[in-house]
Amino acid sequence: MGLSPAVEKSTLGLHSIQQYEPLIGRAAVARILDKAARLGPAHLVHISSTFYGGGVTEILTPLTLMMNALGIATSWHLIQGTPAFFACTKKLHNTLQGDPMAFSDEEIAIYEQVVSENALRLHLEDCDVVAVHDPQPLPLVGHFTDRSMPWLWQCHIDLSTPNAAVWNYLRSFVERYNVAIFSLPEYAQALAVEQRFVAPAIDPFSAKNTEMSEDESLACLVRHCIRVDRPVITQISRFDRWKDPMGVIEAFRRARAEVDCTLVLLGNNATDDPEGQVMLETIRHAVDDGIIVLTADDPLLVNALQRQAAVVLQKSTREGFGLTVTEAMWKGAVVVGGEVGGIRRQIQDGENGFLVSTVDQAARRIVQVLKDPGLRQRMGARARESVRERFLLSRLLEDWLDLLAAYRLHR
């Protein structure tokens, strides 16, 4: 019996850098293979807070497979936590993106206690490099004082305007690492340790991004009761206030007053995000007959929506890096994104997408695209090429090979 289409597509190319040759060229593939060979045996351990939902998971899932396929032993461990712990770490996330709320002594105690319990479960004696992702497991480094291997902390959050008090607290942990890695240079902080900058990337061979025919994508939308006889506008993201779903709904309503269209909000909630369900309920109370809210965990639906949408929105008010922006651009979509964080590095306004700061600007761009069918084709072609050049997983893989070459423990 053959694999289901979802399984078959989800495994295409995950293990082989050679799959990328038609996209990045033979010389780039050879360079990556040479870097991996020169590293020799190495063991890298990633530590994060969830296997499900969110950008870190989207990145580490294919990256760990590709590194193992290259002969770099790469493991991925999760920390466990109580609902109270994840409520605290969500608050940390929000404050790092500029929320002015305070982090109480009780919350600090919960945060540090749960991380200390997780340290007891981790056995890292045989690895060459430890990579810790985002604030949730950050204090782990303090529980391995006799460590001999380098520790790297990678922050995937928009740190352009962090809450000063909370950042000062977390900085005491960050400065115990050998290096802090941020998505963009504008997130750099005043730190006593080295800082590096590594932008995220997408896997073009995953079920979410692999090629899909017009008939396949239309059929997928129909299965989910999405009308295909009028233009579709979509935003695909976590249900999170930083993604501004209420602003998306308002921009859509203003655009719909001029051009008939449908809005599809598709999202899921990561297991380390306790606020998501509250936001989802808020959205559901705000919708009307022209707005569809879906929570399906279906990468093929994401693929189909990004291919068929007349406009893809990512109207974030904070965004470390918009993976959904890159995914949609890879499919030749016109993306209207918030003029914040990493989105400003992904979209060159008016060239390969549009940047907006207000609801009214978003509505005007939606109408502009709907009234100019050729614009999507012209702008979409430039969008896809910019992703091919800068934001494919092969580039991220090479960045990690360079990090390992610089920091690994030579036994």
Predicted regions and their residues:
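Aromatic "clamp/platform" in nucleotide-sugar-dependent glycosyltransferases that forms part
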Residues: T317
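Nucleotide-activated donor-binding/catalytic signature segment of Leloir-type glycosyltransferases, i.e.
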Residues: G267, T271, E275-A304
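A conserved mid-protein helix/loop that constitutes part of the nucleotide-sugar donor-binding site
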Residues: E58, D240-R254
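Conserved acidic donor-binding segment of nucleotide-sugar-dependent glycosyltransferases
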Residues: D349-D360, Q368-P373
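Short alpha-helical segment that forms part of, or immediately flanks, the ligand-binding pocket
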Residues: N303, T326-W330, R344-R345, E351
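A short, well-ordered alpha-helix in the C-terminal region of glycosyltransferases
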Residues: Q368, L375-R390, L396-D402
